């Protein structure tokens, strides 16, 4: 395995980690939108009182905090994965030359 292969492995691992982070965050909103209760609420939204459809600022703030924590957790995991591949590449580099 040459240095080009190790570099390609590191680049691919970064792209995979970034893709997983994006889809893991986006998947929660898609899952929430497809729940039967949410669909039923959307179908009967015409009959609902508008004041009940508003999300309180506390709920919105806690959702943002959870999303920020999730982003940080995924970023740390991605850095760990990339770090492991970088260490492997540096250890194998003298044998490849």
Curated annotation (Swiss-Prot):
Family: Belongs to the RxLR effector family.
Keyword Hydrolase among record annotations: no
Coiled coil (UniProt feature): none
Superkingdom of the organism of origin: Eukaryota
Signal peptide: 1-21
Topology in the lipid bilayer: Single-pass type I membrane protein
Any Gene Ontology CC annotation: extracellular region
Tagged with keyword Metal-binding: no
Primary location class: secreted
The species this protein was found in: Bremia lactucae
Transmembrane segments annotated in the record for this chain: 69-89
Name of the protein this chain belongs to: Secreted RxLR effector protein BLR05
Domain notes for this protein: The RxLR-dEER motif acts to carry the protein into the host cell cytoplasm through binding to cell surface phosphatidylinositol-3-phosphate.
Compartment annotation: Secreted; Host endoplasmic reticulum membrane
Keyword field: Host endoplasmic reticulum, Host membrane, Membrane, Secreted, Signal, Transmembrane, Transmembrane helix
Assembly mode: Interacts with host transcription factor NAC069.
Protein role: Secreted effector that inhibits stress-induced relocalization of the transcription factor NAC069 to the nucleus, thus affecting its broad role in abiotic and biotic stress responses.
Intervals of motif RxLR-dEER: 32-60
